[in-house]
Amino acid sequence: MCGIFGIYSYERLNVAKKIYYGLFALQHRGQEGAGIATSDGKNIHYYKNIGLVTDVFKNETLQNLFGYIGIGHVRYSTTGGKAVENCQPFVVKSSFGNIAIAHNGDLVNSDELRRELEMKGHIFTSSTDSEVIAQLLVRELLKTSDKIEAIKNTLKKLVGAYSLLIMFNDSLIAVRDPWGFKPLCIGRDESNIYISSEDCALTTLDAEFVKDIEPGEIIEIKDGEIISHKLDYGVSEYNPVNVDVPCIYRGAATCMFEYVYFARPDSTIDGISVYKVRKRIGKILAKEHPVDADVVSPIPDSGVTFALGFSEESGIPYYEGLIKNRYVGRTFILPSQNERELAVRLKLSPVKSVLEGKRVVLVDDSIVRGTTSRRIVNMVRKAGAKEVHLRIGCPKIISPCYYGIDMATKKELIASNKTEEEIGKAIGVDSIGYLSLEGLVKAIGRKDLCLACVTGKYPTEVNFEKILGRE
């Protein structure tokens, strides 16, 4: 999962500083690296490096990124390591001059596409599938003078998740894959048109939300105009669960984890408030897994809104039993287990006056490996909690994700081979309760969702050898 942000200034103003602010608003989507590319109409200028947005970009760097068109990226690695070569945007040479590409998502057929390109003589500078997309586009641009046709022909080869920003010298193009895995939206103000992974970044820049880019839609921005194109092929219907809620986009499979964990609570995805979804999840969770307790406490920050809903529905008072160190990043998206475990100790501190002698309900968004949860429960018990109950605002994660979320291998997923009782014992809680699949879908309010990680049913074909390799 990454964050992408683009601007086209129809008043020909430099956009690098605004992209910086947009990426800062999307920092929760990736903390390993950041990059910005801009175009002044003739040349593309770019800079990228490892680190947070505030670490990568200083005023001098931004001042050297001239241009009225620009794209930016914050990186969270799922394919490729931490090296600066894997940071984005990627800038490649084409028959139209240099082009820059920023990508959010993962392809399931990237290995095959990479091998085909290497056999044709392409040399890759990174290990990411984003560069594969860039090189495919370069080849298609040799065959036609129509940029949109070349992009469509490139997209026909891709299977998986891709929200893309593609910048030519004179235009900005945004793409959302036919499944709509990752969010992407458009905003504008009196001087600029914006493209963003989440609308919270539009709010930061005081821009007006225009629309969500639809699955299978290509948005072309040129000469200050927004032109919509649609892919001329569809995808198979994907309905892994029968729940009486509407579809927003027929055939879509938007990642449910955006609503549960990744997106900022103040964002709205495809017309649905993330905050309201999480509040509803907490209320449904309290109905599905009631418990006698004295305190409801979130595991911050992602558990906060769930815990508020749980408290409201159950009548159990809400307290902050764990305090977060705001200078430590999100533990789930750190790339190694050692880093995650150290981050937990640095990140959270128990409030003894809240927890001591109390029956405590801890509420969190999900359990992936279980190691973080076990450490937190141990921390709460050491603070004097009499009982510790865990409630999870997501069904059990039983299968890996191949679309851009680092959910490890199947054997590392604690729920893939354990019952709820066994998980509770392994983590050290008095009871554990997961949100049901039906409860999740009802809380989100749409059924055109990717639920592969909690059902094992994937919306696209996935190479079986790749699955075995990851297991």
Swiss-Prot record:
PANTHER family: AMIDOPHOSPHORIBOSYLTRANSFERASE. It is an enzyme of class 2 (transferase). This is Amidophosphoribosyltransferase. [4Fe-4S] cluster binds at residues 255, 401, 450, 453. The keyword Iron applies. It comes from Methanocaldococcus jannaschii (strain ATCC 43067 / DSM 2661 / JAL-1 / JCM 10045 / NBRC 100440) (Methanococcus jannaschii). Binds 1 Mg(2+) ion per subunit. The active site is at 2 (nucleophile). GO terms for molecular function: 4 iron, 4 sulfur cluster binding; amidophosphoribosyltransferase activity; magnesium ion binding. Keywords: 4Fe-4S, Glutamine amidotransferase, Glycosyltransferase, Iron, Iron-sulfur, Magnesium, Metal-binding, Purine biosynthesis, Transferase. Its cofactor is Mg(2+); [4Fe-4S] cluster. Its EC number is 2.4.2.14.
